[in-house]
Amino acid sequence: MSLPILDQLEEKIKQAVETIQLLQLEVEELKEKNTTVEQEKETLRQEYEQLKSEQQSFQDRLRSLLGQIDNV
């Protein structure tokens, strides 16, 4: 192989390595974002369950009050 061909090959290899490194960084960033989103999802799920429970309590109290009104 001639020297220019080796230089071209070396340059292409360097570019490929740089691209791989950039993609690895991007993958790490996406993993971190995914972790954050999963945590937010879990927080929202817990909040939803709490609100659902509160709603059920309010409905039960309202039914009880309506029942008392009906008895009057």
Curated annotation (Swiss-Prot):
<dbReference type="GO" id="GO:0000917">
    <property type="term" value="P:division septum assembly"/>
</dbReference>
<dbReference type="GO" id="GO:0043093">
    <property type="term" value="P:FtsZ-dependent cytokinesis"/>
</dbReference>
<comment type="subunit">
    <text>Homodimer. The ends of the coiled-coil dimer bind to each other, forming polymers. Interacts with FtsZ.</text>
</comment>
<dbReference type="GO" id="GO:0005737">
    <property type="term" value="C:cytoplasm"/>
</dbReference>
<keyword id="KW-0132">Cell division</keyword>
<feature type="coiled-coil region">
    <location>
        <begin position="5"/>
        <end position="71"/>
    </location>
</feature>
<dbReference type="Pfam" id="PF06005">
    <property type="entry name" value="ZapB"/>
</dbReference>
<protein>
    <recommendedName>
        <fullName>Cell division protein ZapB</fullName>
    </recommendedName>
</protein>
<keyword id="KW-0131">Cell cycle</keyword>
<comment type="similarity">
    <text>Belongs to the ZapB family.</text>
</comment>
<dbReference type="InterPro" id="IPR009252">
    <property type="entry name" value="Cell_div_ZapB"/>
</dbReference>
<comment type="function">
    <text>Non-essential, abundant cell division factor that is required for proper Z-ring formation. It is recruited early to the divisome by direct interaction with FtsZ, stimulating Z-ring assembly and thereby promoting cell division earlier in the cell cycle. Its recruitment to the Z-ring requires functional FtsA or ZipA.</text>
</comment>
<keyword id="KW-0717">Septation</keyword>
<keyword id="KW-0175">Coiled coil</keyword>
<keyword id="KW-0963">Cytoplasm</keyword>
